[in-house]
Amino acid sequence: MDLFRKPKKRNAPVVRKKESSSDEDQDSEVKDVIQKRRRTNPMVQSTKQLDASTRRADNSSDDSDDSDDNQDIAVATHSFAASGDAGPSGPRDQGATATLEVDTDYSHDAQAQFERVQQQLKEGVEKDGKILYKGSALYGAKEAKDTAKGNAASGYNRVGPVRAPQFLRQTVRWDFAPDICKDYKETGFCTFGDSCKFVHDRSDYKHGWEIDEEYEAGKYGAEDDANYEIHEGDDTFPEDCFICGNPFVDPIVTKCKHYFCTGCALKSFQKSSKCPICQQNTENIMNTAKELLTYLKRKKQQQKQEAEKQEEEKDSDDDEKPHECDDHHHHDHEDEPEEPENDSNVPEAEEKSDEEQEIMMEDVEGLEGGENDSESDDDDAEKD
């Protein structure tokens, strides 16, 4: 049995909207709405999230209800026309000549007043024997000569307010200690961070003795084309086996891309399945090093071709040497006096010289007063 009786809820009274009798008032009402784009703040979050379906339903209902009202709403939109200039929007000098107008104007500061007084003193106070009045600023004023105040006409060394720099642009230079942070250069990380007094730079540097060597060799500042060469992949292949240190015999390659002789690898893997170089587990997997074999074969062919070229060059040099010797002897003979071409002509010349001597002797015997003449006279006397 219920001791307390619950009261029944009454329905809310239905309020009927009053219809406006005048249609002219509705037409005269114009709403001015400015569309604002709401910016969502990522820091503000709500626990209530609506489903996509409910959001679509709400939006559709709102659009249907407001479709009739939006017909008479004047929407104010803001648009800005482009300037049509391809250059920057700021000044052409990028603000290099912009001035700071916070301080006192240069025409009214203490420096300007000092300069005006000095100019008046130079022009002179007296004119036609009369003293001219030029303001209270000249009471007791004297032309500053050979003094610190007079020499410092710029005003930067005087006592009093100093004229501040007018331009906004400034150049800031960070002067680091002449040392490089070793941790940052090697690892790229420093525990001190931005408070480290050493330079955080990972670029390469040269020692002083290296620069001196380049300067003495005449290579200082010259670019080496070899620094920009892209080497082929053949340079990555080793020349000898890592285990035995000898040239490869039936080379194999492991999973970690290391090359060994077949016999050396089998002996090493009997003790441990780890790679002797990188200590990774190879799982005793070995493959034939086809790339290494092709590289070694191509290298042998290149060496053979180079040896043949060297032999050909040596042979050509040997052939050129005898010709050079012949030319040398030829030049020597040209310096010597000319000799008869054939040796057979030498005795003929000697015979000719003997005949000439005999003829000469006969002529001498035929002369008067000679020995032959006396003998002939004796013979004639005996006959008689």
Curated annotation (Swiss-Prot):
GO terms for cellular component: nucleus; U2-type spliceosomal complex. GO terms for biological process: DNA repair; protein ubiquitination; snoRNA splicing. Residues 1-11 have a biased composition (Basic residues). Residues 1-96, 299-384 are annotated as: Disordered. InterPro entries: CWC24-like, Znf_CCCH, Znf_CCCH_sf, Znf_RING, Znf_RING/FYVE/PHD, Znf_RING_CS. Residues 60-71, 351-384 have a biased composition (Acidic residues). Residues 303-312, 320-334 have a biased composition (Basic and acidic residues). PROSITE patterns: ZF_C3H1, ZF_RING_1, ZF_RING_2. Keywords: DNA damage, DNA repair, Metal-binding, Transferase, Ubl conjugation pathway, Zinc, Zinc-finger. This is Probable E3 ubiquitin-protein ligase rnf113. It comes from Caenorhabditis elegans. The gene is rnf-113.
